[in-house]
């Protein structure tokens, strides 16, 4: 069936009735729909990736990883529309759970209570514990990638930039596609620490918590230099130990050229916040990635005590770096090679 909503054509099976366009991105559009046999409301994400290799790679990562994880706080793929044949295959249709809104919209339209902040951060960290136990870095955690429903259930989405945490690829390759929103980027990414760890996701969670507490982004940098300045305006000039933790000589010289800055207390920035929230925030936003808490440690923090249950915070089996073999050889893959990989991935799900 070809359905249209706002002049958008969705070539999906007759099992689905398309309702409304609910989101648009660089290479995709999302509609709400009803799965007629079950009556279930779903979201259908239409992706047209074949114009750019980068979009193909993102689509492949997203499909493979969302199929791998089976977690309450990670969006799942219910189905993928099977193409008629390889030759005419030009669009990917992912059928997913329907979530009503996202954290970006919620923060923009209402003040969040402390209870909301607790519950949302708990769910983000619960998802992150599973991802990190599987040796996956999300690399693009931000409010718009946190989907919410009316019950305040939270699900992390958009794994298009995800990577193996044990990858052998060098940092320059790791960064090639790094277009993650600057405001949630850890300082080591800008200072080229040479190796990137699970701590980059933890930093993003800290930025999200800060934004939930105040309703505004904590570090809304206009460019690379401004971003770093805003971080140092709050955290202060790095200690000698943290300074020498920066492997890049050029980055160290740049930091040394900046005027000395004193640390600003989070209590003065967020005067109405729960002190326990601010204590967790300090641990999430440590300048030195080696000193940041892990997702598992953060879940045990007193701020999250109302929700923490060690028996209900599942891990996931580690993913072999070979899962991302296509990423390692991506420079030698043609768009047709990538199309074949995506086609095979879809057919394997439908089998």
UniProtKB/Swiss-Prot annotation:
UniProt motif (TXY) ranges: 176-178
UniProt GO cellular component terms: nucleus
UniProt-annotated catalytic positions: 140 (proton acceptor)
Source organism, top-level taxon: Eukaryota
UniProt pH dependence: Optimum pH is 6.5.
The UniProt record lists the keyword Zinc: no
Residues found modified as Phosphotyrosine: 178
Activity regulation comment: Activated by tyrosine and threonine phosphorylation. Inhibited by the MEK inhibitor U0126 but not by the p38 inhibitor SB203580. Cobalt abolishes kinase activity, while calcium, copper and nickel have little effect on kinase activity.
Location(s) in or outside the cell: Nucleus
CDD domains on file: STKc_ERK1_2_like (cd07849)
Residue ranges occupied by any Protein kinase domain in the UniProt entry: 16-304
GO MF term (any one): protein serine kinase activity
Major localization listed first in the record, in broad terms: nucleus
EC number: 2.7.11.24
Residues where ATP binds: 22-30, 45
GO terms under biological process: mitotic cell cycle G1 arrest in response to pheromone; response to pheromone; signal transduction
Modification after translation, per record: Dually phosphorylated on Thr-176 and Tyr-178, which activates the enzyme.
Temperature dependence per UniProt: Optimum temperature is 30-35 degrees Celsius.
Keyword Transferase listed: yes
InterPro entries per UniProt: Kinase-like_dom_sf (IPR011009), MAP_kinase (IPR050117), MAP_kinase_CS (IPR003527), MAPK_p38-like (IPR008352), Prot_kinase_dom (IPR000719), Protein_kinase_ATP_BS (IPR017441), Ser/Thr_kinase_AS (IPR008271)
Cofactor notes: Divalent cations including magnesium and manganese.
Comment text on domains: The TXY motif contains the threonine and tyrosine residues whose phosphorylation activates the MAP kinases.
Stored PANTHER family: MITOGEN-ACTIVATED PROTEIN KINASE (PTHR24055)
Function summary: Serine-threonine protein kinase which may be involved in pheromone signaling. Functionally complements the MAPK pheromone signaling pathway in S.cerevisiae.
Family: Belongs to the protein kinase superfamily. CMGC Ser/Thr protein kinase family. MAP kinase subfamily.
Protein's UniProt name: Mitogen-activated protein kinase 2
Gene: MKP2
């Amino acid at each position: 069936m070809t359905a249209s909503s706002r002049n958008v054509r969705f070539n999906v099976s007759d099992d689905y009735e398309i309702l409304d366009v609910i989101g648009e991105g660089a290479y995709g559009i999302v509609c709400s729909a009803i799965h007629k046999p079950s009556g279930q409301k779903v979201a259908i994400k239409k992706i047209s990736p074949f114009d750019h290799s980068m979009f193909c790679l993102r689509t492949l990562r997203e499909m493979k990883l969302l199929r791998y994880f089976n977690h309450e706080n990670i969006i799942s793929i219910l189905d993928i529309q099977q193409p008629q044949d390889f030759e005419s295959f030009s669009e990917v249709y992912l059928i997913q759970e329907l979530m009503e809104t996202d954290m970006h919209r919620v923060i923009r339209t209402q003040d969040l209570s402390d209870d909301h902040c607790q519950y949302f951060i708990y769910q983000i960290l619960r998802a992150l514990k599973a991802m990190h136990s599987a040796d996956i870095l999300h690399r693009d955690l931000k409010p718009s990638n946190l989907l919410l429903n009316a019950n305040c259930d939270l699900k992390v989405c958009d794994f298009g930039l995800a990577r193996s945490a044990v990858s052998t690829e060098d940092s320059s390759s790791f960064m090639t596609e790094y277009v993650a929103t600057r405001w949630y980027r850890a300082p080591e990414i800008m200072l080229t620490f040479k190796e990137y760890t699970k701590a980059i996701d933890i930093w993003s969670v800290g930025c999200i918590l800060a934004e939930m507490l105040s309703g505004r982004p904590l570090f809304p940098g206009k460019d690379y230099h401004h971003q770093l300045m805003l971080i140092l305006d709050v955290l202060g000039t790095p200690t000698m130990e943290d300074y020498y933790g920066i492997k890049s000589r050029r980055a160290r010289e740049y930091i040394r050229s900046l005027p000395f800055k004193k640390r600003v207390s989070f209590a003065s920035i967020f005067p109405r916040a729960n002190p326990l929230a601010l204590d967790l925030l300090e641990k999430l936003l440590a300048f030195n990635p080696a000193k940041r808490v892990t997702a598992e440690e953060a879940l045990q923090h007193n701020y999250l005590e109302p929700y923490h249950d060690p028996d209900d915070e599942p891990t996931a089996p580690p993913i072999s770096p070979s899962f991302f073999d296509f990423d390692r050889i991506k420079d030698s893959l043609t768009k047709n090679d990538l199309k074949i990989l995506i086609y095979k991935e879809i057919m394997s799900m439908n089998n």
